[in-house]
Amino acid sequence: MNLTRREFAKANAAAIAAAAAGLPILVRASNLVTEADVTSLVWNKAPCRFCGTGCSVMVATRDGQVVATHGDIKAEVNRGINCVKGYFLSKIMYGSDRLTRPLLRMKDGKFDKQGEFQPISWEQAFDIMAEKFKAALKAKGPESVGMFGSGQWTVWEGYAANKLFKAGLRSNNIDPNARHCMASAVMGFMRSFGMDEPMGCYDDIEATDSFVLWGSNMAEMHPVLWSRVTDRRLSAPQVKVAVLSTFEHRSFELADLPMVFKPQTDLIILNYIANHIIESGAVNRDFVERHVRFAHGAEDIGYGLRPDDPLEKKAKNADKANTWSDIDFKAFAEFVKPYTLERTARESGVPAERLKALAELYADPKRKVVSFWTMGFNQHTRGVWANNLIYNIHLLTGKISEPGNSPFSLTGQPSACGTAREVGTFSHRLPADLVVTNPKHRETAEKIWKVPAGTIQEKVGFHAVQQSRMLNDGVLNVYWTQVSNNMQAGPNVMQEVLPGWRNPDNFVIVSDVYPTVSAQAADLILPSAMWVEKEGAFGNAERRTQFWHQLVKAPGEAKSDLWQLVEFSKRFTTDEVWPAELLAKAPELKGKTLYDVLFRNGQVDRFPASDLAKGYANDEVDAFGFYIQKGLFEEYAAFGRGHGHDLAPFDAYHEARGLRWPVVDGKETRWRYREGYDPYVSKGSGVQFYGYPDKKAIVFALPYEPPAEAPDQDYPFWLATGRVLEHWHTGSMTARVPELYKAVPDALVYMHPEDARQLKLRRGSEVKVVSRRGEIRARVETRGRNKPPQGLVFVPFFDANKLINKVTLDATDPISKQTDYKKCAVRIELLNLA
């Protein structure tokens, strides 16, 4: 075979990705010849279906199926390469057990909670859903119904769900699975800056001198970005990489400063760095005086456990967790003074010389620094504090909001930013950083949505972990989940998740593509379309919004989540779900369906079907008779335009490889809050953190506080959970790709060889991982990619046959309500198979 240089480069990239998973090099063949006249393939762009990096891929279709993908060479994010998951995108939709018809638990021809799943029609599915919703609403009100959504929802799916629940059904009990991964990042941004989402962008990678990873294994979780970090590190001799984690992983291979610290002591390290910056005279005084104020956050705030838990009863400020008082720089300096190098080395276990070298990276005024973090910071009972403390360091030094200087929170899902955060599908949020507790914010949403004043409830709804508890307690009775698998991904499954789903008083609906663990525990399963089987939009970690067209049809009777939400809204009239006093404010809405009120309101339905680009299918346009995606997007965009969240016109995104908001006058923003880059910054001001009225960011004084649970005599090991390169989240897609499944078929218990020896275990021994809440069986791994220190084990959560979340603790950050999956106590027992 004769290859051009371009073909060779593409084949080589494919080979590298394949080799990472131990796959045959022949994978290159599917990514070589792409000319349509040779292959009869039709190629279109789409963002990758997996992580929050937002890689763009070229998708090939033929005879109504996706048959190949390759990296999009025109994309700024990934520049033509993909990780190993991205190279197998063409296979994720075609698992042999794809769901194609609604399935209801039935016995003797009718619904039975203990019955077997039997196929029914969509009409029957919506009939029983409407019956259950209406009965719960009539008996107990809006608090009795809820929804669990996703950072994998498209922008308009999340927006439609938000409208349906918060305005239509008047229930704020809607929360995304991003609560498990990004809620602490959200609250960190909101507290420090008054606005959500990163100020920097991926361009920082090529502009910086230093990378510091805090609880982020980018080599496996953001591998395409890691390739850019690696290129920068190997291309510029002055560049340094520091990696901090509770165990050694693949990102350590590039580290100049590798640091394994004891769980929870990242808080101590962060405060030490701030102290070092102050004591060494490295504070950027001019920046701090002009752009920063100081606050002391509430302490002893509890652990987000049930109110009757002894730890919650003991906490002094559990009900005031998100409060603070103003202090000055001098008081802040006194606060961090006890966090000395000696104390930090002793309590964290990191050698003093490495800690000092890390602090000097930040303190050196000649060095630019990018701090990256993911779940190690966010899945943390003090995750919001950890986010605030890293911002402290960048603010004290002025290393922020400019090329190469950036604190950068990386997201895990393809639209955790674009949908969960920006659309506001959390139980306390509305679009564009508005919140349900603020009367002016509710008024803004009600006006845009054209519903009566008072429609949106002011009480915050149940967050993700609370939803499980309320199902368990019988408070929440009808529950619909889409694009999520909480029976596998949620914490403390056996005590808090499963009992609520199987509670005979509750009715649970799961919309999904495959029969996941969650689907198998549900009462009604709805088959969903996925990825390019529908038109969609995602928003990635650098504020980049990306669109794609529908390229193929979904199999059987599978329907998009958008269609399901909008079609279901036809089953309710305002008389059935709104009180008389609310209808009295808008008598013209009396008797109308929620579909009429929310989706045929003169805004969502104002774009005709003829606006659809020629040559593309759109099943929702066919179903509803208008360009619903465009209408939903433009209505949603009204929340942010003119308020620092500006989005471009709908059609611009189909032409571009994504645009980073705010987009003003057709120009995207790469660095927020900095004059010359951000159109919202006043001329001559240099920097304005305009999320707060005084345009200043806040530096927080926050202490070290211990975790909710730590090893003891009965449970002597720390347990951390997480992911691996080859699988994504719960593996419901990647485990159905033969090559990825073959590469990593099972979750393993990674542990230190000396711990294994002391327990008379060896590599491959089958063990039980046991906590106070549950247990699983798995095999020991003492070699390979993950190298825990003594006293800690790591188990990934992708394996549906080894549900590690039977074991985890449902402690959460009291401010963000995000679960700490990185710290609980377990013991390891050898299985006696005799």
Swiss-Prot record:
Its EC number is 1.9.6.1. Mo-bis(molybdopterin guanine dinucleotide) binds at residues 85, 152, 177, 181, 214-221, 245-249, 264-266, 375, 379, 485, 511-512, 534, 561, 721-730, 805, 822. Pfam families: Molybdop_Fe4S4 (PF04879), Molybdopterin (PF00384), Molydop_binding (PF01568). Substrate binds at F797. GO terms for cellular component: membrane; nitrate reductase complex; periplasmic space. It is found in: Periplasm. Binds 1 [4Fe-4S] cluster. PROSITE patterns: 4FE4S_MOW_BIS_MGD, MOLYBDOPTERIN_PROK_1, TAT. Residues 41-97 form the 4Fe-4S Mo/W bis-MGD-type domain. Predicted to be exported by the Tat system. The position of the signal peptide cleavage has not been experimentally proven. InterPro entries: Asp_de-COase-like_dom_sf, CT_Nitrate-R-NapA-like, MoPterin_dinucl-bd_dom, Mopterin_OxRdtase, Mopterin_OxRdtase_4Fe-4S_dom, MopterinOxRdtase_cofactor_BS, Periplasm_NO3_reductase_lsu, Prok_molybdopt-oxidoreductase. The keyword Acetylation does not apply. Residues 1-29 form the signal peptide. It catalyses: 2 Fe(II)-[cytochrome] + nitrate + 2 H(+) = 2 Fe(III)-[cytochrome] + nitrite + H2O. PANTHER family: PERIPLASMIC NITRATE REDUCTASE, RESPIRATORY NITRATE REDUCTASE. Catalytic subunit of the periplasmic nitrate reductase complex NapAB. Receives electrons from NapB and catalyzes the reduction of nitrate to nitrite. HAMAP family: Nitrate_reduct_NapA (MF_01630). This is Periplasmic nitrate reductase. The gene is napA.
